[in-house]
Amino acid sequence: MTFDSFADANEAEVTRAITRQWTDEFLDDTETDVIIVGGGPSGLMAAKELADRDVDVTIIEKNNYLGGGFWLGGFLMNKLTVRSPAEAVLDDLGVPYEYDEENDGLAVADAPHACSAMITAACDAGARIQNMTEFTDIVVRDDHAVAGAVVNWTPVHSLPRELTCVDPIALEADVVVDATGHDAVVVSKLHERGVLEADGIEHVEEHATGMDQSGDGEYGAPGHDSPGHDSMWVADSEDKVVEQTGKVHDGLVTAGLSTATVHGLTRMGPTFGAMLLSGKVAANAVMDELAVDEPRVDLPSTAAPAADDD
């Protein structure tokens, strides 16, 4: 077959096609079963598992891209690690990996391959995405039960205040998942209003530790300075993050690093098994909240405990 030409379409038709499809989907997003705030590995995994079970899921992501820190393995190196038994997730995604020559319980994979496969799996399952969309507040009901998310377009946040006043809008959901990573921004809204106590967020307030202390218009470090969670301890952190993932308030579930921040847990650094399995646990917590009559998400078999140091 030889190429002849593209189908005929003019500029106005292109614009209408984009606008029509986006509007139709966004109208569906105004009332949904679950809103997942944050499109990193834990949020994507939760979305994939829920959508696989016919739960309506919308991911809100403030960046133009999905994946969070999953695109890199740390220190600008694009190899990532997962500790056994989480390599089973890579098997499910069709991502090749090798076991480290020093530790056969540590699987190493290409980060771009793993991240793009995770994004594809969530989209293929039916999760809807609203990227360049920033979470600004929660929708609440009696006793501050969480009932949705207040959002605005991300670029609005970067405009000088004196130039713009753009009100946000609200999306309703039966459950919201905080998968926003280090900052745990959804839970923070309840904490700052005295609705719940979060050890890590309280630490931030007491010690003025934050993700980025640079001023407007300045370049700053990305803030890996233990803003709310504790310092790095891989073996301790990953198990506890998975164990403590779940419901923290009516209508609100945490997943991934937001769980570490909420509970003041240690952090795991550049290894992603806990992020992926936490997303699965979060999906189960959401289904419990929704009373979904579908099979629960299975977790891979527990790895053998590490040998004590000599």
From Swiss-Prot:
Reaction(s) catalyzed by this protein? Answer: [ADP-thiazole synthase]-L-cysteine + glycine + NAD(+) = [ADP-thiazole synthase]-dehydroalanine + ADP-5-ethyl-4-methylthiazole-2-carboxylate + nicotinamide + 3 H2O + 2 H(+)
Q: Which residues carry this modification: 2,3-didehydroalanine (Cys)?
A: 165
Query: Which GO BP terms apply?
Result: thiamine biosynthetic process; thiamine diphosphate biosynthetic process; thiazole biosynthetic process
Q: How is it modified after translation?
A: During the catalytic reaction, a sulfide is transferred from Cys-165 to a reaction intermediate, generating a dehydroalanine residue.
Task: List the coiled-coil residues.
Answer: none
**Protein name, as recorded:** Thiamine thiazole synthase
For this chain, the family text in UniProt reads: Belongs to the THI4 family.
Q: Which GO terms describe its molecular function?
A: cysteine-dependent adenosine diphosphate thiazole synthase activity; iron ion binding
Instruction: Identify the metabolic or biological route this protein is part of.
Output: Cofactor biosynthesis; thiamine diphosphate biosynthesis
Q: What is its EC number?
A: 2.4.2.60
Its quaternary organisation is:
Homooctamer; tetramer of dimers.
What is known about what this protein does? Involved in biosynthesis of the thiamine precursor thiazole. Catalyzes the conversion of NAD and glycine to adenosine diphosphate 5-(2-hydroxyethyl)-4-methylthiazole-2-carboxylic acid (ADT), an adenylated thiazole intermediate. The reaction includes an iron-dependent sulfide transfer from a conserved cysteine residue of the protein to a thiazole intermediate. The enzyme can only undergo a single turnover, which suggests it is a suicide enzyme.
Residues binding glycine? 267
Q: Which residues bind Fe cation?
A: 167, 182
Q: Which InterPro entries match?
A: FAD/NAD-bd_sf, Thi4_fam, Thi4_prok
What species is this protein from?
Answer: Halobacterium salinarum (strain ATCC 700922 / JCM 11081 / NRC-1)
Q: Which cofactor does it need?
A: Fe(2+)
Residue positions binding NAD(+): 42, 61-62, 69, 167, 257
Alphabetically sorted, this entry's keywords are: Iron, Metal-binding, NAD, Thiamine biosynthesis, Transferase
